């Protein structure tokens, strides 16, 4: 079976690294200002207002659940208490794992390829719809398995924590059925935000209306599931309108096999990051996880705003990916993002006692110390998020992501084993901090290595030999 064009250049590294050109210059915007294949004219530099606007749109669109959660978390904390919030933390961490397992963690890589596929006018629809069909088959099959497992779990009445894990896996998996990756790849952040805002508002209304009447952590996750339905439907309506129906899946096995490095690395990162509560639920009680979750929700809300910078810059980075100015632009953007993260970390540290008391109430006073430890991860998570979202996908360096994830996982495993002995939630937080610092350090070193390699390759390109005219005597 011949592989499709969109897979023809794939390597065992999942997606090929984009090579730098052998001569100065780069992608240029067409003289008429339209988007499309490179044309004549000088390279058009996006204004700061355009970049900030895209960041704001992605912040609310892609990570809106955090913003809505911050608005509703006082209600959740006071209705469910520390024990209920701990169970919800288990479900929400499983939500992120389920989302990752369904979409294979390759949405950023696929988004980075959308401009490339759309530039090939003759085969654009055929390639895009084949990719959509193969990707849908994988996601739909996995989400269905989660749904069956959830139904069986409720039928046999498994323990409450296990129910929350399976419910979270299914809710996260359903969310990953959306075609939002296409919108991000096309740079249509306003459209993405509009569609997702519908779901966020539905979640807010459902939570406020149902949770006080049915004070149960299951209800909070079910509200999130129901609110995902209109967003998923709208993204599919948009994709169908622009590209038509997805093609019959033919190469899903190839996509699965070659997505393994990215999937494994993302799963490892999620395991010691957003999915930590699911893993630590085996050694910590729900109350301890509830205290941890209180501070973690605030930290993740801020982190989501910082993560959005990388997503907003991804299409621009992809357009800059084939000229030497890419690394200078990347370094400047990373430095600014880390500075913002450091400022946010310091602000949260100072305001921790007031925030915990205001948002969660006096029952969660013990969360203050945990919050002050966890806010220190923000600069590190910002480094990792920016490099793995806006730089490595453009350079198609999946091995760098995998190695970083392995390093973080080794540290997290050590912290988990230590937690078995200490039975202290502080061990969880310190382990998370050390893991994030380790991974961020690795990615900075990896970024430096790739930049030096690309510059070395560009510097060693031989100049063309121009024959001299012979002078006759």
Residues of each region from the PLM?
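Signature of the first transmembrane helix
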Residues: 3-5, 11-17, 21-35, 47-107, ...
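Interhelical loop/hinge segments that connect adjacent transmembrane helices in multipass membrane
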Residues: 31-47, 51, 193, 217-224, ...
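Interfacial segments at transmembrane-helix termini and the short loops linking adjacent helices
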Residues: 154-170, 350-383, 426
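Membrane-interface junctions at transmembrane-helix termini in multi-pass inner-membrane proteins
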Residues: 172-195, 378-406
């Amino acid at each position: 079976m011949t592989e499709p064009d969109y897979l023809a250049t794939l390597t065992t590294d999942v997606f090929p690294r984009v090579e730098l050109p052998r001569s100065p210059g780069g992608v240029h915007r067409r003289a008429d200002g339209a988007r499309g294949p490179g044309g004549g004219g000088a390279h058009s530099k996006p204004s700061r207002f355009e970049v900030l606007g895209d960041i704001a749109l992605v912040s609310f669109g892609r990570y809106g659940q955090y913003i809505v959660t911050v608005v509703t978390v006082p209600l959740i904390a006071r209705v469910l208490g520390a024990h209920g919030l701990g169970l919800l933390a288990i479900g929400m961490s499983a939500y992120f794992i389920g989302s990752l397992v369904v979409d294979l963690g390759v949405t950023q890589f696929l988004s980075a390829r959308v401009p490339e596929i759309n530039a090939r006018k003759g085969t654009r629809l055929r390639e895009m719809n084949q990719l959509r069909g193969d990707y849908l088959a994988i996601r739909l099959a996995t989400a269905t398995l989660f749904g069956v497992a959830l139904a069986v779990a409720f039928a046999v009445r498994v323990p409450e924590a296990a129910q929350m894990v399976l419910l979270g896996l299914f809710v996260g998996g359903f969310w990953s059925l959306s075609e939002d990756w296409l919108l991000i790849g096309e740079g249509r952040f306003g459209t993405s935000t509009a569609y997702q805002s519908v779901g966020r508002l539905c979640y807010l209304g459902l939570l406020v209306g149902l949770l006080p009447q049915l004070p149960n952590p299951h209800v909070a996750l079910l509200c999130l599931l129901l609110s995902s339905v209109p967003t998923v439907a709208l993204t599919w309506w948009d994709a169908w309108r622009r590209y038509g129906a997805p093609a019959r899946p033919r190469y899903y096995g190839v996509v699965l096999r070659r997505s393994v490095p990215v999937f494994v690395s993302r799963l490892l990162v999620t395991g010691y990051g957003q999915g930590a509560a699911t893993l630590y639920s085996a050694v910590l009680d729900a109350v301890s996880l509830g205290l941890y979750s209180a501070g973690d929700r605030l930290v993740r809300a801020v982190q989501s705003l910082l993560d959005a910078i990388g997503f907003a810059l991804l299409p621009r980075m992809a357009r800059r990916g084939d000229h030497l100015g890419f690394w200078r632009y990347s370094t400047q953007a990373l430095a600014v993002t880390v500075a913002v993260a450091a400022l946010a970390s310091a602000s949260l540290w100072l305001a921790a006692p007031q925030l915990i008391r205001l948002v969660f109430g006096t029952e969660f006073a013990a969360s203050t110390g945990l919050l002050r430890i966890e806010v220190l991860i923000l600069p590190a998570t910002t480094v990792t998020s920016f490099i793995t979202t806006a730089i490595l996908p453009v350079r198609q360096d999946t091995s760098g992501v995998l190695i970083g994830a392995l390093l973080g996982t080794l540290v997290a495993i050590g912290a988990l084993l230590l937690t078995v002995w200490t039975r202290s939630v502080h061990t969880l937080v310190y382990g998370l901090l050390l893991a994030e610092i380790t991974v961020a350090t690795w990615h900075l070193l990896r970024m430096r290595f790739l930049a030096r390699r690309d510059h070395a390759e560009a510097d060693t390109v031989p100049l063309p030999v121009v024959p001299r005219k012979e002078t006759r005597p």
